[in-house]
């Protein structure tokens, strides 16, 4: 039987306090016993960076790898070339950009890459709306005042606004983007916009009150708030660079819970420090964990605040962890049993070809 390699983050005492932290090395998605009962070996580690990492050493003869977007084991072409037995790569969560998908298609006759589609879309959508409110209402510096023993209403109120009557736009209107728009509807925004290659159904557009904009540059120029909810692929990497940010409405807010590499971190930091952006919030970084010197850890608006960044947590609530742990087990069961009856929406690449358009328009190579 085969070896399963699981790359997760360490939970330490927190994993003991909260058994629901399934996405930790201590709790192993709650499936160690089940995997071993199937006759397989499970190796779990958080050590994933560098040539001498446990990840690199154990990957060589692993048949299955499981990792998460929150502590991704990056499956580069170089690593895949060394993984002679690898047949299945599972993302416990959503987003498989940590895998070189073109290389996966050409390795070992085609490695199947699957993720637990839909497992944390509600979690992320809620986090997006929360972050928008934190930024627009200038909550973070106000809370810092209280913690620091200060009290200066004017200092925080001068950069505090209402979400009502603002224009909000999402880049990407898939499972997360649509849910963000639905949750924003009760706030009576002036307009809800979206940019995506695939439009919403007319009845959904009408129900939400959303409008599609054909040009990304046109959309961001109209928005008070822009939220990024698209996958990372070759066409979205570095999408929010100095040029695109310069087209955003002066004093607007940018929220990114998609992937860190979709924005050019230095350009976002500079736009925030100059005041062109009133605020930036997000939980995604590249690489992850974010280095201590990452500029978006510290960048602020000239008036203070404007930074609502956190570790990659939006999609890993306790509720989400239950869903993606169960979904991971279902994918493994499909593989171990030899049925290979995966849910179509969970497949990213399979049989040496792309199973979805979510990662860009590609041709089989």
Swiss-Prot record:
PROSITE patterns: D_2_HYDROXYACID_DH_1 (PS00065), D_2_HYDROXYACID_DH_2 (PS00670), D_2_HYDROXYACID_DH_3 (PS00671). It catalyses: formate + NAD(+) = CO2 + NADH. Gene3D superfamilies: NAD(P)-binding Rossmann-like Domain. Belongs to the D-isomer specific 2-hydroxyacid dehydrogenase family. FDH subfamily. It comes from the Eukaryota. This is Formate dehydrogenase. Catalyzes the NAD(+)-dependent oxidation of formate to carbon dioxide. Formate oxidation is the final step in the methanol oxidation pathway in methylotrophic microorganisms. Has a role in the detoxification of exogenous formate in non-methylotrophic organisms. It comes from Emericella nidulans (strain FGSC A4 / ATCC 38163 / CBS 112.46 / NRRL 194 / M139) (Aspergillus nidulans). Homodimer. The keyword Iron-sulfur does not apply. Its EC number is 1.17.1.9. Induction: Acetate induction mediated by the amdA regulatory gene.
């Amino acid at each position: 039987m085969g070896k399963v390699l699981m790359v997760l983050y360490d939970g330490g005492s927190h994993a003991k306090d909260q058994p629901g932290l399934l996405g930790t090395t201590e709790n192993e998605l709650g499936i160690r016993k089940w995997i071993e009962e199937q006759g397989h070996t499970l190796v779990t580690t958080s050590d994933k960076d560098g040539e001498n990492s446990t990840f690199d050493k154990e990957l060589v003869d692993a048949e299955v790898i499981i990792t998460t977007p929150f502590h991704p084991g990056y499956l580069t072409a170089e690593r895949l070339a060394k993984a002679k037995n690898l047949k299945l790569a599972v993302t416990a969560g959503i987003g498989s950009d940590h895998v070189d998908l073109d290389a996966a298609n050409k390795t070992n006759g085609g490695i199947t890459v699957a993720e637990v589609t839909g497992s944390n879309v509600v979690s992320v959508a809620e986090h997006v709306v929360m972050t928008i409110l934190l930024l627009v209402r200038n909550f973070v510096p106000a809370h810092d005042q209280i913690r620091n023993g200060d009290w200066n209403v004017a200092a925080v109120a001068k950069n505090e606004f209402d979400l009502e009557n603002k224009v909000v736009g999402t880049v990407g209107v898939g499972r997360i983007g649509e849910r963000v728009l639905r949750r924003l509807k009760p706030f009576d925004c002036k307009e809800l916009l979206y940019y995506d290659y695939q439009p919403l159904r007319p009845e959904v557009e009408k129900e939400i009150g959303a409008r599609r904009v054909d040009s990304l540059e046109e959309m961001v120029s109209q928005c008070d708030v822009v939220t990024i909810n698209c996958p990372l692929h070759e066409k979205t990497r570095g999408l929010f660079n100095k040029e695109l940010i310069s087209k955003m409405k002066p004093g607007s807010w940018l929220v990114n819970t998609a992937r860190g590499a979709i924005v050019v971190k230095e350009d976002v930091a500079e736009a925030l420090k100059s005041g062109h952006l009133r605020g930036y919030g997000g939980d995604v970084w590249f690489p992850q964990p974010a280095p201590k010197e990452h500029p978006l850890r510290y960048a602020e608006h000239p008036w203070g605040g404007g930074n609502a960044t956190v570790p990659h947590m939006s999609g890993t609530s306790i509720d989400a962890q239950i869903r993606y742990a169960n979904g991971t087990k279902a994918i493994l069961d499909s593989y171990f049993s030899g049925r290979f009856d995966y849910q179509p929406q969970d497949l990213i690449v399979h049989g040496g070809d792309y199973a979805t358009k979510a990662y860009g328009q590609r041709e089989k190579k």
